[in-house]
Amino acid sequence: MRERLDPVDPAHLRPAFKTVLRHLQRGKALEEMVFVQGHDLLALDGTGYFSSKAIACDSCLEKHHRNGTITYSHQMLGAALIHPDKREVIALMPEPIVKPDGTEKNDCERNAAKRFATKFRQDHPPLKVMVTEESLSSNAPHMETLQAHNMRYLLGVKEGDHAFLFEQVAQAEHAGRVTYYDRDDHNANVHHRFRFVSNLPLN
């Protein structure tokens, strides 16, 4: 199977993903996936699916180690429509993260996200989505890409990666500009406390 699939350009799979989503839209299946204010929740995350120190191709990403060895890998930016109350997800066409033809420089998740956003809007121009991603995606250039493609976003942040932002939150809290929301999850016996604050600089 791998020998058959390896030479196939992933772009040839794009029409299949597009057709599946179109059929789901026509069948009203996406109506159950609406998350908030008419927007579907679109999860994006980079992942690796091949790694080897012995097997490589021209498209492999390369990681050079201090001991002189090289790890070759293939990665992709995975995408799926999700809903917190649903077990089912709707997979969308992933974007490969591979070394471009004729270059020595590795590709990266940020560049893959730019390509994904462009292709997504070409395939699904009217679909309202809210992108959710991990802390590594919480940077101004990526947010500008999402905004340019009419995508809302809900991005995670970590204190270690966004120290300045957390300082701003602490100052806003001290000034009384933070709104709190408490919620009990009785099934898990957990109490949640959320803090909301707007109009803070990211960095």
Regions found by a protein language model. Give the residues of each.
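Short, conserved catalytic/metal-binding motifs centered on acidic residues
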Residues: M1, G38-Y49, A79, A113, ...
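A short glycine/small-residue-enriched secondary-structure motif
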Residues: M1-R4, T19, E173, R195-V197
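Active-site-proximal, Lys/Arg-enriched surface segment
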Residues: R4-K86
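A generic alpha-helix structural signal
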Residues: F17, K114-A117, V169-A170
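Short, glycine/charged-enriched secondary-structure capping and boundary segments
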Residues: A56-S59, E144-A148, Q168-A170
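Electropositive, glycine- and tryptophan-enriched low-complexity nucleic-acid-binding patches
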Residues: H64-L127
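Domain-level cores of phosphate- or acyl-group-handling catalytic modules
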Residues: T103-F164
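An anionic, glycine-rich sequence signature occurring as long contiguous blocks
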Residues: E159-N203
